[in-house]
Amino acid sequence: MFCIIGWRTNRTTEDLGKRRMQKQSSTSLQSPAYSFGEFFAALISAFDRQGLRLCVLRNYECFPSSNAGRDVDLLILASELPRAYLALQSISGIRVIGYTERRYVASFFLSGIISESKARALQIDFDLSLTWKGLPFLSEKEVLEAAIPRPAGNLIFYTPCPVHEAVISLLASLLVGGWLKEKYLPKVQQVFADDRLAVIASLSPTLGLKVATQLVDSVIGCDRRKVLGCVRSLRWSLVLRNFLRRPEHSIGAVFKHYASELRFRYSLEILQTVRIAGTDVCDRRTVVESLISILQCSAVLVEARSFGSMSGLSSQLPAEDSRADPHAQSYRGLFGSVATVLRWLLQEWKSQFLGNRNLTLRISESNFCDLLIDPRRYGYAGPMWIARFAGRLFPPAILWVLLESVLEKANSRKLELSSAETLRQREGYLSFVRRGNNYIILDSGKAVESIIEDAYLAIIDTLAQRTDCKLKTRF
């Protein structure tokens, strides 16, 4: 299956790493993917064994046969999170490949579930509190106690009562984000109109009678402008009432909320990068495009990133299907080359910390090693020691996937290169990925479907190993 696999380890033999990956990948292949209905039934049973109620907050209308969204939102108490993790862990054939936690929500990313077209993963969000900036607008304990049982075949799961569901659906976007989620608005309006007094009574303890009444009547009147105009008063009322009732607790809650958000958003673990390397650009792009499809839901965002989009060097290159000699491109000059390398380094670190508000899996189809191995192709005229030094400063990838081309195939794709140069580049890529990186080497001469499946399994194994270490520390 896999040609070679290596890890950061003091052991020098690659055979040991190869056997380890083959063992893990065979386990993955022996566990067929669940349909959503099969997984949901297993999840209910697992929760029952842990003595937990499975309370689904929204988008449950098609349960258990199908899931209308790309995730499942469940409500539990924060103290129940360890047992919820044990419930997920007990489901045979499911692997936890990602985990993030904030003060108000813990997200698990599970592989082995058919959730979308071609995708094989599902995001499970455990809402731990119903808050804004750490200040509660509704008691999660009261919501769970008032939850209504709903049949799912021979099993039962729970949903919030209509009043609580409507309030949560409205305020989750209005109070937290300052916007209306049109998808839920008709149902919210209907519940508010049918149970106006009950909704006001539910909101009054945290928002006050006047603000709660104004909001409910604006929703019933279908006046979106007035509803959005309530955002400021909603937030101020929530802050004032919490600070007047429990000032020390509220100050601590707000401080912990912002500290948690800063730690989460600027963590190196929020962006995980897999780099696809190899001499054949066409092979790399085909693999990346296919991986993006089947890796959906393996993180909040699964994206592709290319060398050209970061470096600005792509404008110099001919089209990939062109037979023009890429080495005939003009050089940038010494200072221009060095500036380009440094700019790309800064952009890589900037993208590592900024713009990623949730867990992101990035598949990079070309890498800085391309420049190190074939500098002429990119018009680089600077000292190679600067390029190599900058390469060591780049954010580390969690996995390198090297597509090792058969020499004959590489020569047929790159007619402008001599056999000796093609061989040199091939050896250069092999040497680069073996330099202490977590890597896998695949034979690009095999069928494309087989290459993609092997790469997918390697990525899932890597994500699962990293997540397992993280969860052992957390739980």
Which role fits each region the language model picked out?
Residues 22-72, 76-272:
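Conserved NTP-donor binding/palm subdomain of two-metal-ion nucleotidyltransferases/polymerases, i.e.
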Residues 229-232, 236-247, 411-475:
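NTP-dependent small-molecule kinase module
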Residues 274-291:
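Glycine-rich phosphate-binding P-loop
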Residues 293-304:
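Post-Walker A helix-loop "phosphate-sensing" segment adjacent to the P-loop in P-loop NTPases
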Residues 307-380, 384:
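ATP-dependent small-molecule kinase phosphotransfer cores
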Residues 366-432, 438:
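A glycine- and Lys/Arg-enriched "phosphate-lid" helix/loop adjacent to the NTP-binding pocket
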